[in-house]
Amino acid sequence: MSKGFFVDTTRCTACRGCQVACKQWHGNPATPTENTGFHQNPPDFNFHTYKLVRMHEQEIDGRIDWLFFPDQCRHCIAPPCKATADMEDESAIIHDDATGCVLFTPKTKDLEDYESVISACPYDVPRKVAESNQMAKCDMCIDRITNGLRPACVTSCPTGAMNFGDLSEMEAMASARLAEIKAAYSDAKLCDPDDVRVIFLTAHNPKLYHEYAVA
């Protein structure tokens, strides 16, 4: 059965446990960075960073709020990145029937028009390595979930912000949580729930969290 995530940003504390767990499980190196006077680190996705907690300070109702957004690939129902890559090589990006995972393979390095693949993503997720055209992003921890384990990011979350299971279960959980918080947050919404397998809940306008929070 198709899988999915429910990401409840109202429960995210920006501990970045998900970000660290993702790197540890995939054996990816830390990103060289510098102190910019802001807490978000690294500043953006890269070839070795598939999960990133974005942090934005916003003035809401006359007070400063810190908004956290644990960003990742949405594993779209109809992934435009794959549709674009398929024009060159239908095996460069795989859409797994069993899980719904959108998986970038090493064959992406042979795609000449990699820029079109990247720009096709409405969430600005894929990144390429400097040495070639090979691209990478969240792989849904497909090696874990096909062996009965949850994704690394989900197992590390201490607050219940990250959730994973059958897509129908995640959709129901997201809808129930939205109804629960609507009284306190009138602008709360689910981000593109009909188009993605990673459903984000935001308490405020999604664009306050990240420019590409919604398509």
Swiss-Prot record:
Alphabetized UniProt keyword annotations: 4Fe-4S, Electron transport, Iron, Iron-sulfur, Metal-binding, Periplasm, Repeat, Transport
Top-level taxon of the source organism: Bacteria
Residues that coordinate or bind [4Fe-4S] cluster 1: 12, 15, 18, 157
Pfam families cross-referenced by the UniProt entry: Fer4_11
Co-factor remark: Binds 3 [4Fe-4S] clusters.
Transmembrane regions listed in the UniProt entry: none
Cofactor(s) needed by this chain: [4Fe-4S] cluster
SUPFAM superfamilies on file: 4Fe-4S ferredoxins (SSF54862)
Primary localization class, coarse: periplasm
Gene name linked to the record: fdhB
Record-listed [4Fe-4S] cluster 2 binding positions: 22, 138, 141, 153
List of residues binding [4Fe-4S] cluster 3: 73, 76, 81, 121
Biological role: Beta chain of the formate dehydrogenase (FDH) catalyzes the reversible two-electron oxidation of formate to carbon dioxide. FDH loses activity in the presence of air, but this activity can be restored. This chain is an electron transfer unit.
Subcellular localization(s) per the UniProt record: Periplasm
One Gene Ontology molecular-function label: 4 iron, 4 sulfur cluster binding
Every 4Fe-4S ferredoxin-type domain range: 3-32, 129-168
Annotated source species: Megalodesulfovibrio gigas (strain ATCC 19364 / DSM 1382 / NCIMB 9332 / VKM B-1759) (Desulfovibrio gigas)
Protein name listed in UniProt: Formate dehydrogenase subunit beta
